[in-house]
Amino acid sequence: CTLNLTEGLSGMQEHNPEDYITKVTAVSPDDIGADIWNDTLNLIFCDDRELIKYVQRIVGMAVIGKVYIEALIIAYGEGRNGKSTFWNAIARVLGSYAGNMSADTLTVGCKRNVKPEMAELKGKRLIIAAELEEGMRLNTSVIKQLCSTDAVYAEKKYKAPFSFIPSHTLVLYTNHLPKVGASDAGTWRRLIVIPFHARIEGDSDIKNFADYLVDHAGGAILKWIIEGSRKVIIEGFNM
């Protein structure tokens, strides 16, 4: 089905070629595995209901396909806290609406041409960058371009340059917070840090848990995301 997010789950309709939709989620929304997903949220976010609601709105806003908050979402916490599991499960459920970017692309130490990577962002809703090295400094010009409503200038290899209006939200999950210049107000304004304080070990640590979540609760995860979108839209895109 195709979903009109302004109507939430009631906005389901049959696929229509005239919609010109070229991407698809990996699952359809349903309630199967909802208990598994809710238990996972409580575990990862330490039963913090307000934080869970906030993160649901962040993810829900991301999938709308228009930039309403010009921000880099930083999921921060020491290892074994579920942050990679959470974001990888979200990304896999979103299928071709999600993509990845090398974390070093965001840093001043990156010397390669990043325009081919930027070209892959066109039409995506959620972009994940994973794990910065300790002490890395953010490249302010790259952050401002990727976390903005302004056109992104990119090019694929051996192709002519082009520009596009961003539709994505960029998430960086990392054990180490990046460095930012103290006087760089523009970059500070674009940073939203989501804390991950859980310590998941022993019986609570399931290997390849993101795959397990998608296999056993993928539809419930997508439904949770759609509900987040609906809440954000009703509240006027205010976080």
Set out the residue ranges of the language-model regions.
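Feature primarily recognizes SF3-like P-loop helicase cores of small DNA viruses
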Residues: C1-M239
